[in-house]
Amino acid sequence: GGGRRSGNRFFNCHSSHGVVDMNKAIAQSCDSYFYHFAQAVGFDQVADMASLFGMGKQFDLPVNSQFFGTVPNAAWKEKKFGRPWEPFDTVNASIGQGYYLASPLQLAVLSARLATGKALNPRLVMDGPAKDPMAYDFRPDDIAYIRQAMSDVVNGAGTARRAQLPLPDVKMAGKTGTAQVVSLSISDGRSGPWKYRDHGLFVFFAPFDNPRYAGAVVIEHGGGSGSAYPIARDVMTFLFDPQKGLEALRALEQQWGGTAQQRLEQRYAAYAAARGSTVKPPPRREEEIFDQVEAEARLAARQSEAIATDAIKPRGETSSVATPPSPAATPATEAPATPAPSATPPSVVPETTP
Protein backbone atom coordinates (compact mmCIF):
# COMPACT_ATOMS: atom_id res chain seq x y z
CA GLY A 1 0.00 0.00 0.00
CA GLY A 2 0.88 3.67 0.00
CA GLY A 3 1.78 5.94 2.85
CA ARG A 4 3.63 9.09 3.87
CA ARG A 5 7.04 9.72 5.39
CA SER A 6 7.47 12.02 8.38
CA GLY A 7 11.08 12.41 9.49
CA ASN A 8 12.60 8.95 9.74
CA ARG A 9 9.22 7.21 10.08
CA PHE A 10 6.98 5.91 7.31
CA PHE A 11 3.24 5.86 7.99
CA ASN A 12 1.44 3.24 5.95
CA CYS A 13 -1.93 3.29 4.29
CA HIS A 14 -3.81 -0.01 4.19
CA SER A 15 -3.95 0.04 0.38
CA SER A 16 -2.91 1.88 -2.80
CA HIS A 17 -5.74 4.12 -4.02
CA GLY A 18 -4.27 5.96 -7.00
CA VAL A 19 -5.45 9.54 -7.55
CA VAL A 20 -7.64 10.51 -4.60
CA ASP A 21 -10.06 13.34 -3.86
CA MET A 22 -11.96 13.85 -0.60
CA ASN A 23 -14.94 11.73 -1.64
CA LYS A 24 -12.73 8.78 -2.55
CA ALA A 25 -10.58 9.26 0.57
CA ILE A 26 -13.66 9.01 2.80
CA ALA A 27 -15.28 6.17 0.87
CA GLN A 28 -12.13 4.02 0.66
CA SER A 29 -10.57 5.20 3.94
CA CYS A 30 -7.34 6.49 2.42
CA ASP A 31 -5.09 7.37 5.36
CA SER A 32 -2.48 9.09 3.17
CA TYR A 33 -4.99 11.75 2.10
CA PHE A 34 -5.62 12.75 5.70
CA TYR A 35 -1.92 12.55 6.59
CA HIS A 36 -1.21 15.09 3.85
CA PHE A 37 -3.97 17.61 4.52
CA ALA A 38 -3.63 17.56 8.31
CA GLN A 39 0.00 18.57 7.85
CA ALA A 40 -0.99 21.18 5.26
CA VAL A 41 -3.55 22.99 7.46
CA GLY A 42 -1.94 22.31 10.85
CA PHE A 43 -3.42 20.07 13.48
CA ASP A 44 -4.64 22.83 15.79
CA GLN A 45 -7.34 23.64 13.23
CA VAL A 46 -8.27 19.97 12.98
CA ALA A 47 -8.51 19.75 16.78
CA ASP A 48 -10.73 22.85 16.94
CA MET A 49 -13.13 21.30 14.42
CA ALA A 50 -13.16 17.99 16.31
CA SER A 51 -14.15 19.83 19.49
CA LEU A 52 -16.89 21.66 17.61
CA PHE A 53 -18.37 18.30 16.62
CA GLY A 54 -18.42 16.96 20.18
CA MET A 55 -15.05 15.31 20.71
CA GLY A 56 -13.72 15.74 24.25
CA LYS A 57 -17.08 17.09 25.49
CA GLN A 58 -19.42 16.22 28.34
CA PHE A 59 -23.15 16.28 27.59
CA ASP A 60 -26.09 17.27 29.78
CA LEU A 61 -27.26 13.78 30.70
CA PRO A 62 -28.08 12.38 34.18
CA VAL A 63 -25.16 9.96 34.25
CA ASN A 64 -21.91 10.24 36.15
CA SER A 65 -19.86 7.89 34.00
CA GLN A 66 -19.31 10.03 30.92
CA PHE A 67 -15.82 9.73 29.49
CA PHE A 68 -14.35 13.02 28.32
CA GLY A 69 -11.74 11.55 26.00
CA THR A 70 -8.85 13.55 24.58
CA VAL A 71 -8.55 15.91 21.64
CA PRO A 72 -4.79 16.48 21.51
CA ASN A 73 -3.03 19.58 20.23
CA ALA A 74 0.27 21.36 20.80
CA ALA A 75 -0.84 23.12 24.01
CA TRP A 76 -2.25 19.89 25.46
CA LYS A 77 0.95 17.93 24.82
CA GLU A 78 3.16 20.67 26.24
CA LYS A 79 1.05 20.85 29.40
CA LYS A 80 0.78 17.09 29.90
CA PHE A 81 4.23 15.89 28.88
CA GLY A 82 6.37 19.03 28.73
CA ARG A 83 7.31 18.24 25.13
CA PRO A 84 6.59 20.05 21.86
CA TRP A 85 4.19 18.81 19.22
CA GLU A 86 6.03 16.93 16.47
CA PRO A 87 5.13 16.40 12.79
CA PHE A 88 4.57 12.69 13.42
CA ASP A 89 2.00 13.60 16.10
CA THR A 90 -0.03 15.32 13.39
CA VAL A 91 0.17 12.28 11.14
CA ASN A 92 -0.92 9.95 13.93
CA ALA A 93 -3.76 12.15 15.14
CA SER A 94 -5.07 12.89 11.63
CA ILE A 95 -6.67 9.42 11.54
CA GLY A 96 -7.65 9.28 15.22
CA GLN A 97 -4.56 7.44 16.46
CA GLY A 98 -1.86 8.53 18.88
CA TYR A 99 -3.20 10.52 21.83
CA TYR A 100 -6.80 10.65 20.57
CA LEU A 101 -9.46 9.15 22.86
CA ALA A 102 -13.21 9.18 22.23
CA SER A 103 -16.32 7.54 23.67
CA PRO A 104 -19.08 5.86 21.62
CA LEU A 105 -21.48 8.63 22.70
CA GLN A 106 -19.13 11.32 21.40
CA LEU A 107 -18.81 9.44 18.11
CA ALA A 108 -22.61 9.22 17.83
CA VAL A 109 -22.90 12.97 18.43
CA LEU A 110 -20.18 13.58 15.84
CA SER A 111 -22.18 11.55 13.34
CA ALA A 112 -25.40 13.45 14.07
CA ARG A 113 -23.72 16.84 13.74
CA LEU A 114 -21.97 15.88 10.52
CA ALA A 115 -25.24 14.61 9.08
CA THR A 116 -27.28 17.71 9.87
CA GLY A 117 -24.83 20.59 10.09
CA LYS A 118 -26.39 21.43 13.47
CA ALA A 119 -25.14 21.37 17.08
CA LEU A 120 -27.35 18.46 18.13
CA ASN A 121 -27.02 17.14 21.68
CA PRO A 122 -28.10 13.78 23.12
CA ARG A 123 -31.11 13.87 25.42
CA LEU A 124 -33.56 11.54 27.13
CA VAL A 125 -36.85 11.09 25.28
CA MET A 126 -38.85 11.69 28.47
CA ASP A 127 -37.30 15.15 28.81
CA GLY A 128 -39.83 16.45 26.31
CA PRO A 129 -39.43 18.14 22.92
CA ALA A 130 -35.91 19.05 21.89
CA LYS A 131 -34.91 22.67 21.55
CA ASP A 132 -34.03 23.87 18.08
CA PRO A 133 -30.27 23.27 17.75
CA MET A 134 -27.89 25.93 16.57
CA ALA A 135 -26.96 25.59 12.89
CA TYR A 136 -23.27 25.66 12.04
CA ASP A 137 -22.06 28.20 9.51
CA PHE A 138 -21.51 25.58 6.82
CA ARG A 139 -22.51 25.84 3.20
CA PRO A 140 -25.33 23.46 2.24
CA ASP A 141 -23.21 22.14 -0.62
CA ASP A 142 -20.47 21.12 1.82
CA ILE A 143 -22.94 19.23 4.03
CA ALA A 144 -24.38 17.49 0.96
CA TYR A 145 -20.85 16.55 -0.16
CA ILE A 146 -20.03 14.85 3.15
CA ARG A 147 -23.38 13.06 3.17
CA GLN A 148 -22.73 11.71 -0.31
CA ALA A 149 -19.17 10.64 0.53
CA MET A 150 -20.36 8.78 3.62
CA SER A 151 -23.17 7.22 1.60
CA ASP A 152 -20.55 5.95 -0.86
CA VAL A 153 -18.82 4.18 2.05
CA VAL A 154 -21.89 1.93 2.27
CA ASN A 155 -23.68 2.19 -1.05
CA GLY A 156 -20.77 2.79 -3.43
CA ALA A 157 -17.24 1.44 -3.80
CA GLY A 158 -16.51 1.99 -0.11
CA THR A 159 -15.23 0.00 2.84
CA ALA A 160 -18.64 -0.99 4.28
CA ARG A 161 -20.60 -2.30 1.30
CA ARG A 162 -21.94 -5.19 3.41
CA ALA A 163 -23.67 -2.59 5.60
CA GLN A 164 -26.25 -1.71 2.94
CA LEU A 165 -29.78 -1.75 4.34
CA PRO A 166 -32.14 -4.36 2.86
CA LEU A 167 -34.63 -1.55 2.26
CA PRO A 168 -35.12 -0.12 -1.24
CA ASP A 169 -36.13 3.35 -0.09
CA VAL A 170 -33.61 3.98 2.71
CA LYS A 171 -29.86 4.38 2.33
CA MET A 172 -27.54 4.53 5.31
CA ALA A 173 -24.34 6.59 5.31
CA GLY A 174 -21.35 5.81 7.50
CA LYS A 175 -17.62 5.77 8.07
CA THR A 176 -15.51 2.81 9.07
CA GLY A 177 -12.72 3.07 11.60
CA THR A 178 -10.04 0.90 13.16
CA ALA A 179 -8.38 1.76 16.47
CA GLN A 180 -4.96 0.14 16.64
CA VAL A 181 -4.22 -1.50 20.00
CA VAL A 182 -0.56 -2.49 19.67
CA SER A 183 2.25 -1.98 17.18
CA LEU A 184 2.10 -3.94 13.93
CA SER A 185 5.38 -5.52 15.00
CA ILE A 186 3.42 -7.30 17.76
CA SER A 187 0.17 -8.11 15.94
CA ASP A 188 -1.52 -7.42 12.61
CA GLY A 189 -4.60 -6.40 14.60
CA ARG A 190 -6.97 -8.81 12.85
CA SER A 191 -5.95 -12.14 14.36
CA GLY A 192 -3.84 -13.59 17.15
CA PRO A 193 -4.44 -13.05 20.87
CA TRP A 194 -7.73 -11.28 21.55
CA LYS A 195 -6.12 -8.55 23.68
CA TYR A 196 -3.90 -7.49 20.76
CA ARG A 197 -6.68 -7.20 18.17
CA ASP A 198 -7.77 -3.80 16.88
CA HIS A 199 -11.03 -2.19 17.96
CA GLY A 200 -13.73 -1.92 15.29
CA LEU A 201 -15.67 1.34 14.87
CA PHE A 202 -18.50 2.56 12.68
CA VAL A 203 -20.40 5.88 12.76
CA PHE A 204 -23.59 6.17 10.75
CA PHE A 205 -26.83 7.99 9.99
CA ALA A 206 -29.92 7.39 7.86
CA PRO A 207 -31.54 8.24 5.57
CA PHE A 208 -28.36 9.72 4.14
CA ASP A 209 -30.14 12.55 2.28
CA ASN A 210 -32.59 13.44 5.09
CA PRO A 211 -31.08 12.12 8.34
CA ARG A 212 -33.43 10.94 11.07
CA TYR A 213 -31.23 8.63 13.16
CA ALA A 214 -27.51 8.65 13.90
CA GLY A 215 -25.30 6.44 16.01
CA ALA A 216 -21.98 4.74 16.58
CA VAL A 217 -20.86 1.17 17.19
CA VAL A 218 -17.58 0.26 18.89
CA ILE A 219 -16.51 -3.38 19.20
CA GLU A 220 -13.51 -3.75 21.48
CA HIS A 221 -10.89 -6.07 19.99
CA GLY A 222 -13.22 -6.84 17.11
CA GLY A 223 -10.33 -6.97 14.66
CA GLY A 224 -11.54 -4.04 12.56
CA SER A 225 -14.65 -2.23 11.39
CA GLY A 226 -16.09 -5.40 9.84
CA SER A 227 -17.19 -6.39 13.35
CA ALA A 228 -19.05 -3.10 13.87
CA TYR A 229 -21.01 -2.12 10.78
CA PRO A 230 -23.22 -5.25 10.59
CA ILE A 231 -24.65 -4.23 13.97
CA ALA A 232 -25.40 -0.73 12.68
CA ARG A 233 -27.08 -2.26 9.62
CA ASP A 234 -29.34 -4.49 11.72
CA VAL A 235 -30.27 -1.73 14.18
CA MET A 236 -31.19 0.70 11.42
CA THR A 237 -33.11 -1.99 9.56
CA PHE A 238 -35.21 -2.55 12.68
CA LEU A 239 -35.85 1.18 13.16
CA PHE A 240 -37.22 1.59 9.63
CA ASP A 241 -38.81 -1.87 9.21
CA PRO A 242 -39.22 -3.73 12.54
CA GLN A 243 -40.54 -6.89 10.88
CA LYS A 244 -37.56 -7.19 8.55
CA GLY A 245 -35.21 -6.42 11.43
CA LEU A 246 -36.70 -9.21 13.54
CA GLU A 247 -36.40 -11.65 10.64
CA ALA A 248 -32.67 -10.96 10.50
CA LEU A 249 -32.45 -11.42 14.27
CA ARG A 250 -34.27 -14.77 14.18
CA ALA A 251 -31.82 -16.11 11.61
CA LEU A 252 -28.94 -15.18 13.90
CA GLU A 253 -30.67 -16.63 16.97
CA GLN A 254 -30.98 -20.00 15.26
CA GLN A 255 -27.20 -20.03 14.87
CA TRP A 256 -26.72 -19.01 18.49
CA GLY A 257 -29.00 -21.72 19.93
CA GLY A 258 -32.19 -19.79 20.59
CA THR A 259 -33.37 -16.38 21.71
CA ALA A 260 -31.53 -14.48 24.42
CA GLN A 261 -34.21 -15.51 26.93
CA GLN A 262 -33.99 -19.17 25.90
CA ARG A 263 -30.20 -19.20 26.17
CA LEU A 264 -30.36 -17.60 29.62
CA GLU A 265 -32.91 -20.18 30.77
CA GLN A 266 -30.76 -23.04 29.47
CA ARG A 267 -27.70 -21.76 31.30
CA TYR A 268 -29.69 -21.12 34.48
CA ALA A 269 -31.18 -24.64 34.43
CA ALA A 270 -27.77 -26.20 33.79
CA TYR A 271 -26.33 -24.24 36.72
CA ALA A 272 -29.11 -25.46 39.02
CA ALA A 273 -28.87 -29.07 37.78
CA ALA A 274 -25.14 -29.13 38.47
CA ARG A 275 -26.01 -28.37 42.10
CA GLY A 276 -28.76 -30.97 42.37
CA SER A 277 -31.67 -28.57 42.13
CA THR A 278 -34.44 -27.59 39.74
CA VAL A 279 -35.95 -24.25 38.86
CA LYS A 280 -39.52 -23.28 38.09
CA PRO A 281 -40.04 -21.94 34.58
CA PRO A 282 -40.37 -18.15 34.54
CA PRO A 283 -43.75 -16.56 33.78
CA ARG A 284 -44.44 -16.42 30.07
CA ARG A 285 -47.03 -13.65 30.01
CA GLU A 286 -47.38 -10.28 31.69
CA GLU A 287 -50.62 -11.50 33.31
CA GLU A 288 -48.76 -14.36 35.01
CA ILE A 289 -46.13 -11.97 36.33
CA PHE A 290 -48.83 -9.66 37.76
CA ASP A 291 -50.68 -12.62 39.32
CA GLN A 292 -47.47 -13.82 40.97
CA VAL A 293 -46.67 -10.36 42.36
CA GLU A 294 -50.22 -9.91 43.70
CA ALA A 295 -50.17 -13.34 45.37
CA GLU A 296 -46.91 -12.51 47.12
CA ALA A 297 -48.34 -9.15 48.21
CA ARG A 298 -51.48 -10.80 49.67
CA LEU A 299 -49.35 -13.29 51.59
CA ALA A 300 -47.20 -10.50 53.00
CA ALA A 301 -50.33 -8.57 54.04
CA ARG A 302 -51.78 -11.58 55.90
CA GLN A 303 -48.49 -12.11 57.71
CA SER A 304 -48.43 -8.44 58.75
CA GLU A 305 -52.03 -8.60 60.04
CA ALA A 306 -51.27 -11.71 62.09
CA ILE A 307 -48.21 -10.13 63.64
CA ALA A 308 -50.16 -6.96 64.50
CA THR A 309 -53.03 -8.97 66.09
CA ASP A 310 -50.64 -10.94 68.26
CA ALA A 311 -48.91 -7.76 69.37
CA ILE A 312 -52.08 -6.19 70.84
CA LYS A 313 -53.49 -9.28 72.65
CA PRO A 314 -52.95 -9.68 76.44
CA ARG A 315 -50.20 -11.99 77.52
CA GLY A 316 -51.21 -15.58 77.68
CA GLU A 317 -53.93 -15.16 75.07
CA THR A 318 -53.24 -16.91 71.84
CA SER A 319 -54.07 -15.49 68.51
CA SER A 320 -57.01 -16.85 66.58
CA VAL A 321 -55.24 -15.95 63.37
CA ALA A 322 -52.90 -18.62 62.21
CA THR A 323 -49.58 -17.33 61.04
CA PRO A 324 -48.54 -18.99 57.83
CA PRO A 325 -45.61 -21.30 58.38
CA SER A 326 -42.19 -20.02 57.52
CA PRO A 327 -40.74 -21.48 54.34
CA ALA A 328 -38.46 -24.42 54.83
CA ALA A 329 -34.79 -23.66 54.94
CA THR A 330 -33.11 -24.05 51.61
CA PRO A 331 -30.38 -26.71 51.62
CA ALA A 332 -26.90 -25.36 51.06
CA THR A 333 -26.68 -27.14 47.76
CA GLU A 334 -29.98 -25.84 46.39
CA ALA A 335 -29.98 -22.99 43.88
CA PRO A 336 -32.54 -20.19 44.40
CA ALA A 337 -35.81 -21.00 42.65
CA THR A 338 -36.09 -17.64 40.93
CA PRO A 339 -37.07 -16.92 37.34
CA ALA A 340 -34.27 -16.64 34.83
CA PRO A 341 -33.22 -13.03 34.25
CA SER A 342 -34.77 -11.30 31.27
CA ALA A 343 -32.66 -10.27 28.34
CA THR A 344 -31.74 -6.60 28.19
CA PRO A 345 -33.10 -4.84 25.08
CA PRO A 346 -30.57 -3.18 22.73
CA SER A 347 -29.84 0.51 23.10
CA VAL A 348 -31.46 2.74 20.53
CA VAL A 349 -29.30 5.17 18.68
CA PRO A 350 -29.96 8.92 19.23
CA GLU A 351 -32.61 10.49 17.01
CA THR A 352 -31.50 13.50 15.03
CA THR A 353 -33.53 16.50 13.94
CA PRO A 354 -33.67 16.72 10.16
Regions found by a protein language model. Give the residues of each.
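N-terminal non-cleavable signal-anchor helices
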Residues: 72, 253, 280, 294, ...
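Short, gly/Ser/Thr-rich active-site loops of penicillin-recognizing serine hydrolases
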Residues: 130-134, 147-148, 229-315
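Beta-lactam-recognizing serine transpeptidase/beta-lactamase-like catalytic domain environment
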Residues: 1-217, 267-275, 299, 309-319, ...
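A generic structural motif
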Residues: 219-223
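Short amphipathic alpha-helical face segments that pack within enzyme cores
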Residues: 103-109, 227-234
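Intrinsically disordered, low-complexity acidic/polar segments
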Residues: 212, 224-226
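Long, low-complexity, intrinsically disordered segments
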Residues: 304-354
